[in-house]
From Swiss-Prot:
The keyword Nucleus applies. Has a role in telomere length regulation and telomere end protection. Acts as an inhibitor of telomerase loading through its interaction with CDC13. It is found in: Nucleus; Chromosome, Telomere. GO terms for cellular component: chromosome, telomeric region; CST complex. This is Telomere length regulation protein TEN1. Keywords: Chromosome, Nucleus, Telomere. The keyword Transport does not apply. Coiled coil: none annotated. One of its GO terms (biological process) is telomere maintenance via telomerase. GO terms for molecular function: single-stranded telomeric DNA binding; transcription elongation factor activity; translation elongation factor binding. Interacts with CDC13 and STN1. It comes from Saccharomyces cerevisiae (strain ATCC 204508 / S288c) (Baker's yeast).
Length: 160
């Protein structure tokens, strides 16, 4: 099951903390073996900012075609409203959505991402597994739900 995360800053902090602990960044003796970390899945509802197409050979070798830049939704009263994040996307996934006229800057997306770690203490990679373009009604219903007592309960269970 994916964890629903509403604030990109919290997601970055959660992943960074997990990465630092597993790699013994704080006070490690440097003699620890490299660990292959389990991947994690998250669901985020965000606003599309732009696409950046990959140019480096390393990104292409890893199977990435572009990065989707996303930003927190303002309706969720996030203290980090301007927080942005770059998510890698495969060419297959980009091609499946590129002709959709609703995929424009500012559009709200329901995105499932996988976070995976390389070996040799490389930083985590955020990759889009799938995404859906949300309608205005979907966004309104989502914002009302997460602000409700039932939504708060759901978020607590999802993130425990």
């Amino acid at each position: 099951m994916s964890q629903l995360v509403l604030d990109l800053k919290c997601l970055k902090d959660k992943i960074a903390t997990n990465y630092d602990i597993h790699n013994n960044v704080y006070g490690g003796n440097g003699m620890e073996p490299n660990i292959i970390h389990p991947s994690k899945r998250f669901r985020i509802v965000v606003r599309l900012v732009d696409f950046l197409f990959c140019k480096s050979d390393e990104e292409f070798i890893k199977g990435f075609f572009c990065q989707m830049i996303v930003r927190n939704l303002h309706c969720l009263n996030s203290t980090n409203g301007a927080e942005e994040m770059r998510l890698y996307m495969s060419e297959r996934l980009f091609s499946a959505h590129k002709d959709d006229l609703r995929l424009i800057n500012g559009q709200v997306l329901d995105v499932r991402i996988g976070v995976w770690y390389g070996i040799h203490q490389s930083p985590p990679i955020f990759e889009i597994i799938d995404f859906k373009i949300l309608s205005r009604n979907d966004v309104r219903d989502f914002c009302e739900f997460v602000k409700s007592p039932l939504g708060e309960k759901f978020l607590n269970i999802s993130n425990s």
